[in-house]
Amino acid sequence: MRPLILLAALLWLQDSLAQEDVCSSLDGSPDRQGGGPPLSVSVTSRGRPTSLFLSWVAAEPGGFDYALCLRAMNLSGFPEGQQLQAHTNESSFEFHGLVPGSRYQLELTVLRPCWQNVTITLTARTAPTVVRGLQLHSTGSPASLEASWSDASGDQDSYQLLLYHPESHTLACNVSVSPDTLSYNFGDLLPGSQYVLEVITWAGSLHAKTSILQWTEPVPPDHLRVRALGTSSLQAFWNSSEGATWFHLILTDLLEGTNLTKVVRQGISTHTFLRLSPGTPYQLKICAAAGPHQIWGPNATEWTYPSYPSDLVLTPLWNELWASWKAGQGARDGYVLKLSGPVENTTTLGPEECNAVFPGPLPPGHYTLGLRVLAGPYDAWVEGSIWLAESAARPMEVPGARLWLEGLEATKQPGRRALLYSVDAPGLLGNISVSSGATHVTFCGLVPGAHYRVDIASSMGDITQSLTGYTSPLPPQSLEIISRNSPSDLTIGWAPAPGQMEGYKVTWHQDGSQRSPGDLVDLGPDISSLTLKSLVPGSCYTVSAWAWSGNLSSDSQKIHSCTRPAPPTNLSLGFAHQPATLRASWCHPPGGRDAFQLRLYRLRPLTLESEKILSQEAQNFSWAQLPAGYEFQVQLSTLWGSEESGSANTTGWTPPSAPTLVNVTSEAPTQLHVSWVHAAGDRSSYQVTLYQESTRTATSIVGPKADSTSFWGLTPGTKYKVEAISWAGPLYTAAANVSAWTYPLTPNELLASMQAGSAVVNLAWPSGPLGRGTCHAQLSDAGHLSWEQPLSLGQDLLMLRNLIPGHTVSLSVKCRAGPLQASTHPLVLSVEPGPVEDVFCQPEATYLSLNWTMPTGDVAVCLVEVEQLVPGGSAHFVFQVNTSEDALLLPNLTPTTSYRLSLTVLGGNRQWSRAVTLVCTTSAEVWHPPELAEAPQVELGTGMGVTVTRGMFGKDDGQIQWYGIIATINMTLAQPSQEAINHTWYDHYYRGHDSYLALLFPNPFYPEPWAVPRSWTVPVGTEDCDNTQEICNGHLKPGFQYRFSIAAFSRLSSPETILAFSAFSEPQASISLVAMPLTVMMGTVVGCIIIVCAVLCLLCRRGLKGPRSEKNGFSQELMPYNLWRTHRPIPSHSFRQSYEAKSARAHQAFFQEFEELKEVGKDQPRLEAEHPANITKNRYPHVLPYDHSRVRLTQLSGEPHSDYINANFIPGYSHPQEIIATQGPLKKTVEDFWRLVWEQQVHVIIMLTVGMENGRVLCEHYWPVNSTPVTHGHITTHLLAEESEDEWTRREFQLQHGAEQKQRRVKQLQFTTWPDHSVPEAPSSLLAFVELVQEEVKATQGKGPILVHCSAGVGRTGTFVALLPAVRQLEEEQVVDVFNTVYILRLHRPLMIQTLSQYIFLHSCLLNKILEGPSDASDSGPIPVMNFAQACAKRAANANAGFLKEYRLLKQAIKDETGSLLPSPDYNQNSIASCHHSQEQLALVEESPADNMLAASLFPGGPSGRDHVVLTGSAGPKELWEMVWEHGAYVLVSLGLPDTKEKPQDIWPMEMQPIVTDMVTVHRVAESNTAGWPSTLIRVIHGDSGTERQVQCLQFPHCETGSELPANTLLTFLDAVGQCCSRGNSKKPGTLLSHSSKVTNQLSTFLAMEQLLQQAGTERTVDVFSVALKQTQACAVKTPTLEQYIYLYNCLNSALRNRLPRARK
């Protein structure tokens, strides 16, 4: 192996030496520096955008290797990115996978020996790619196309768009766009033209292109017209369409629905359609086409002419004319036939008719018939004519009738003729010659039965004789019997004979009768039937009938027929008991008979039971052994020969069988169930009757198939007797009576309220009678009866005491009545174990020592849970442990860390007690303060501001919890003594102590999320302490020098408190308050406020609470409860910061405050509430009113405890008994509740609960549900009104006291969305409700306290009662003291504000109130008319929240203006100076009471509106009419009320009695009507000048006091007033003067609406707020109530919606 390695090394060395020789020879060559001849390199993409192809030609021979390097170039021309390298010995190379359109740098290196390489650098660019998804489409306009595409891959510089015609290559558009442009719109193109779009992608000088072809849309053709050229052709015309290549014509046959299509070339504008159907409507559609586009133009409709009918033929018939023809080709709408000649007639026929008849008789003459064919607007006309001869017009006579007349005078005169006439018609009918000597004349072929006249004419034409006579009539045809409906009737009928007659005669005869035929009956010629009545049934008759005319009769026609037999009469069917048979009986019918046929049917189901033939003498028949309870029908008919009469029918029943096995059971206390078994046979129904003590109670009737029935609404626990009866028609059979009991009544629900070891059980009994029975309440423990107590029926409350906490028992109620007993479902009472008591936490640095007392009862263990509180409000679990002991050591804790400890007791029933939670903080390791800290700095000129510096007591001063300021006038002390901290300002000022504790405040340097201050300056001597002996920062003694020291306390409540002092400061002289500058005093006050806020925040944050161990005098005096007592005011501007601080750490500060309040007032006596006589009057046993504040009712005689009700007086903001808090009434205390309302003069009731929640009755329904009044004791309550909103309901009651005979109105406001033991969803809804309550209370100022209740009267009631004064305090003082408010509440009623969530919610409401800030002025500004409806809807949302907010702003604005006598800016100084001045002047003229003193106010209308003068008070005629004249009033409106004492005739002129004053004379002219409103026209004449003026007087409509007019009435009246004021030619309307003897709400409303309508009509805006404010500032107008303010908006909205404000001049 080694020789081989040595050989390889030698070979390598030899090759290296050879290369060195070559390189040495090259170094000496002349081409060394030049590098050899250059290369010729070419670069191309060869049509592929992602590759570059390099080729080169070497200038010198030799096979060299080549190295290639490729790098991309950026926009600046510099290489970047990864380079591609390649080696080759070829003369070309291709790079693949490049980015299209990108620039690249190429390096080609010739690798020569001895490192004599030659490198060529050049740049190149790949070819770009074409764009993707190129589209060219029409935009809907004939002159534009829109192109769109997706960008080309790779890089590009721009896109070039070339649009040209493909045939001529004429360029239409050439534009370049940036690569970011992906669409382009080409305009101004030729319609209907083909274009090619080329999109060229440029990348440097390289490009790639793609193209697309598209057409523009042609212009749609227009002015399409179609005209008919004949019966089978239509010609169309249209205007040429620009750009259209072809026109598509579609002709639609509107009758057949077929289409005819034709395509014509461009340039053609007309086309004729041939071979169409005559008389047919066609619709033509035209479409212009160019390329793929088709644009439809208008449509046109036209008819072809109808074709002519052929072969019109007129044919005369007897007495009429007949026409026929052949229809032409095609369609038609119909025919019109017009007959002209002696008779004119026009007839219209349908398109399918081909003949017509013109009825006669037609007179002879020449007739022409015109036949017109209709088709759309066109017609075709043909005519035909005919001559109608007289013979054709005369009616044809019946042949065979002969007229033979005698009495012809014989004469020898020749040439006589007999002329025949019809008596009824004037025409000549016959003319024959009469031979001389003839005595009769005969005519043949006449009408039978007709009346003729024959005139004998001489040869000279004279009538010598006239004869009349009749032809013989023909007999009636087809005589037959047509009806035998009744046994005593026959109806005959016949057909009239040809010819005429005057009547018919009919007679008849009974076969076998010896009497002559019956009466002859004459009938008229038009009668063809006769009914023969009162014939004998079952008899045969011969009937004869003939016709007669004049004295001639026809032959008689006879017919023989028989009447039917009569049915039997008085048929009856009844049941006979002895023997038990069903018996039928009847009476014989009149007429003939041979026998009776008797059939018996059973009706259900219909079955023939029996069929018998009885003799003609039979009158009854019986059936035995028929089934029971069935209904039978008997049919009896009479037989006579082969005839059978109609049957007589009747029904009857067999008696039913009684029900068997009757059984009665009680299914419910008020229900009995009766059942039975069906007996054999049938029945129609069952009747079950219920008796109680022999008195019928109820009856039930059921069907025959039923086998049971039930009775409801019975009396519980009662014995009843039941009678069951089977009915079959009128027959019945009863079963034996059965007795039964109803179950006794038991409560349908047991509701228990647990409290410690007792329970209050509400027993809910069903409504209705309680009935009878005995009940017991039973407690069971583990299945064994442990306690039993009798209950009275209906008892609704049960008190269970001395229950074992932590134990479970079951409660049931059992009741017995007779043999029955009932029981409720057991109610499991799981008694919650009591919480641990006397919890004490002793903190140390690394552990907490916890002690407690276990509650009594069945308890097992105590669960202790420990959580570490961290900043931000969260908590981390540490550990938990179960223990049966009463003490626990919690080790391994972190110093100066807060821990939340929760102790819960587990009862023997596995139920947990209420958790007792406390926060305990481990102490610091040890605080080692300096023996004496440096003296503090004192700021001069600020009332002695003492500055505490952070760190002045060492670096561990974070363990300091409290700082104190010690003041002294002793100039010799170096540091304070221990006794100084127990001396107060009172000891110093009045007892002569030289040193005292002036101020105590929490550590202000406690670490917080925000920055910690470096120092804290505290003003000293700023409070007015009076005689308080508590710690107080009182004024310093004037003229004394004071020194100050700082005291630091590590804790306040332990003997281990570490106390440190600073040295005293330099002495400073005190400053008298009188001598102190105002700015200094203000600064001091502000500083005090800041300190108070800071202390409050720190108190809330740290929540100090003392332990249970004994305390020395120092710690007792320094407890926060004692220090701050109950007053903890927070300025409104600091409330948000305080709220956020208290909310930190899971609301820890709120929790500690609430824990402090829990014990307040609990030790106060409640003896009256705990008295046994009053226990059942309390809804909950733990909510009992304190004796000192309870509301006492008037005691009823003989009832010593009737003065008790569960209610307390609560102080309000301005009165010690402003509010009454009470529980929701129980059923038995409703009367006491209304007594409370009446005796305490309550006018507003606030209800904060619903009647029932989650199945629990929270409050009894104590008011009427409808208009029917309800009486409780002496008080009757009427419901007057009820209005429901989303979150509350308003009601108004009228109370009537029967004994006192007095009435009073009370309003109830019920908040309906507040769950029990919870809070509303948002503070805004409750705040809006509070504002509503405040408005109602203001309206009833001084009329008694407000009554507030929920269910218990403490939780929701306490929250609401606390919110009322807190809101008032916030509005009046800009300060909130929630703690003190709740403290006072709990001193007057226990448990006020029941839960922590309610306490926090109270703060949330106040925070919302503060954050609302002042109302936006824009909300109450002018509103455009067009937006007014929207503004009304916005204000009405959320139960009128916007109106409430705006109204509060109005009241505040009115309050701000109170006392100011300055006139408004637009007041007219030349008119009535002011309302006060007017009162002063008029009071001199007429002395009247203050409330009736005259007052006048002017409301100017501006340059185009009318002025309005308002006069109030008892005005006489002189004052009224002279003011009318002075102010140029043209309209006078009187608002006098019916109860005013003024006499109308005193101020109004009468028709015959004008009013005359020193200035004017007033005449009554006439009564008129304006806009539907009655008015009086008055003429006023000025005495000196004689000038006249007409005044329109209108009377304001009357409505009840305190109510408003309906909007429609008021708006109609205002419209009438506006029209009166607008009369005349003046540009400015006449002045309106309104007079009212009293200041009323109606006056305010009228004045406001009158001005608002003027605004709307002239300015097109309205400003309700400003109008109401200006009017209220005037003396003549009252402040509107909230309801009136809303009424103004609604009334104005109605007016604008009805466009009432007409244009006014």
Curated annotation (Swiss-Prot):
Q: Which reaction does it catalyse?
A: O-phospho-L-tyrosyl-[protein] + H2O = L-tyrosyl-[protein] + phosphate
Active-site residues (renumbered): 1350 (phosphocysteine intermediate)
Domain Fibronectin type-III: residue ranges: 37-129, 130-222, 218-305, 306-388, 393-454, 475-569, 565-654, 655-749, 744-831, 832-926
Q: Which organism is it from?
A: Mus musculus
One example of a Gene Ontology biological process annotation: pancreas development
Give the record's glycosylation annotations as residue positions.
74, 89, 117, 174, 239, 259, 299, 345, 431, 551, 570, 620, 649, 663, 737, 851, 882, 970, 982
Occurrences of domain Tyrosine-protein phosphatase (ranges): 1150-1409, 1427-1695
Q: Which CDD domains match?
A: FN3, R-PTPc-V
Q: Name one cellular component (GO) term.
A: membrane
A single GO molecular function, which one? protein tyrosine phosphatase activity
Q: How does it sit in the membrane?
A: Single-pass type I membrane protein
Keywords attached to this entry: Glycoprotein, Hydrolase, Membrane, Protein phosphatase, Repeat, Signal, Transmembrane, Transmembrane helix
Phenotype of gene-disrupted mutants: Mice are hypoglycemic and are protected from obesity and glucose intolerance because of an increase in beta-cell proliferation, insulin secretion, and insulin sensitivity.
Give its localization. Membrane
Q: Which InterPro entries match?
A: FN3_dom, FN3_sf, Ig-like_fold, Prot-tyrosine_phosphatase-like, PTP_cat, PTPRJ_TM, RTP_Phos/Ushers, Tyr_Pase_AS
Q: Name one Pfam family in it.
A: PTP_tm
- EC number of this enzyme: 3.1.3.48
Q: What is its main location?
A: membrane
Q: What does this protein do?
A: Protein tyrosine phosphatase that acts as a regulator of energy metabolism by mediating dephosphorylation of insulin receptor (Insr). Prevents decarboxylation of osteocalcin (Bglap and Bglap2) via an indirect mechanism: dephosphorylation of insulin receptor prevents insulin signaling-dependent decarboxylation of osteocalcin, preventing the hormone activity of osteocalcin. May play a role in the maintenance of pluripotency.
Q: What is this protein called?
A: Receptor-type tyrosine-protein phosphatase V
Binding-site list for substrate = 1316, 1350-1356, 1394
Question: Which residue intervals are topologically Extracellular?
Answer: 19-1077
Residue intervals passing through the bilayer: 1078-1100
